[in-house]
Amino acid sequence: MADKKKRKRSKDDEAEELPFKSILESDDVITELLKSYISSSIKAAAGAGGASSSSSKPLTLADLSLSSSCREVADLSLSSVQTEIETVIVQIARSILAGDGFSFSVPSRAASNQLYVPELDRIVLKDKSTLRPFASVSSVRKTTITTRILALIHQLCLRNIHVTKRDLFYTDVKLFQDQTQSDAVLDDVSCMLGCTRSSLNVIAAEKGVVVGRLIFSDNGDMIDCTKMGMGGKAIPPNIDRVGDMQSDAMFILLVEKDAAYMRLAEDRFYNRFPCIIVTAKGQPDVATRLFLRKMKMELKLPVLALVDSDPYGLKILSVYGCGSKNMSYDSANLTTPDIKWLGIRPSDLDKYKIPEQCRLPMTEQDIKTGKDMLEEDFVKKNPGWVEELNLMVKTKQKAEIQALSSFGFQYLSEVYLPLKLQQQDWL
């Protein structure tokens, strides 16, 4: 009898110690609320689509009469990439033979050449090019690197093999000097040829991972992401290997940090609330961005984002949703529409009574980044984002997802996220 009283008392104490746990509904109630939200969202989307809802194709630059002023790339076959490279080289050879010198016409990826298109809700690249001549001290080295990259990709096309960006760098370390230089030219070449980077058969090393209610085929092998342990399944760097996605999830949870991902994976959060959990462990990589978009488009699931409450967390969210300026030429393939900002939001710091010792003062650079983001069109489009960013800049406070651990290591999965889902508290 004493043991029963002790157990009851310990449960009561736990409820008192965990802020807001007492107002949580049961998992079944929260699940039903989510089902209702998803159902109404689908109906609303169908209604808003009107006559165009019968077509599954998203808006394109051509639909907005922007295809002549903006540049976008497409997936090309290896033979097409090979042909494009050979065409470029033939043009250069003719120019040299005519005595006009040797130069590449390279699309400008400068920040001033980026354009946010509200109708598409993503950043695109304006169609403006610059010359990269060989007979110029300022550009001779970059022109040489461009030529070398083109030759290497041509070899990949002939052999029909994939290499990593690191492999590419090590083919000529003395010339490239630093991988950031070969990576940048690789993006230039992709843009020049009018193809996605994956069309070049150059991939990044595996970085992102996924766990939860998802089954898909990886190069013909069926993968069940509920049986991959805490570490989850590494996201294949070649999206062409991925197919036949199946899921009974209600949403996709996009997590910024590996630590938060591991907490949710170990607690098997996806079994309490059917979901798919994915992370790129920080900055979004191309493979994770492609994989997230594929899940969103094929499974038709809402995407909820869990990021740090700082300008960089929101920046990461915006890269997934609106694209990066560095790869705006491929934003059609790399962006995931309508990602909801679940947390951690600046207003959550007071709402969830995050202790002062778990909050961090923003640096001058943090504040500048926050103010710069307030000037971005994709932020201005969302009043909720503007309000949260203004609050962050005003209070000069930031916090990581791990700040929730001050209430207990499992507070994230036991209270914070369930309550967010219960209240449908996202922007």
From Swiss-Prot:
It is found in: Nucleus. It comes from the Eukaryota. GO terms for molecular function: ATP binding; DNA binding; DNA topoisomerase type II (double strand cut, ATP-hydrolyzing) activity; identical protein binding; magnesium ion binding. Residues 76-209 form the Topo IIA-type catalytic domain. The active site is at Y170 (o-(5'-phospho-dna)-tyrosine intermediate). It catalyses: ATP-dependent breakage, passage and rejoining of double-stranded DNA. Disruption phenotype: Plants are defective in cell elongation and show a severe dwarf phenotype. Coiled coil: none annotated. Its EC number is 5.6.2.2. GO terms for biological process: DNA topological change; epidermal cell fate specification. Keywords: DNA-binding, Isomerase, Magnesium, Metal-binding, Nucleotide-binding, Nucleus, Topoisomerase. PANTHER family: DNA TOPOISOMERASE 6 SUBUNIT A (PTHR10848:SF4), MEIOTIC RECOMBINATION PROTEIN SPO11 (PTHR10848). HAMAP family: Top6A. Belongs to the TOP6A family. Homodimer. Heterotetramer of two TOP6A and two TOP6B subunits. Interacts with BIN4 and RHL1. This is DNA topoisomerase 6 subunit A. It comes from Arabidopsis thaliana (Mouse-ear cress). The gene is TOP6A.
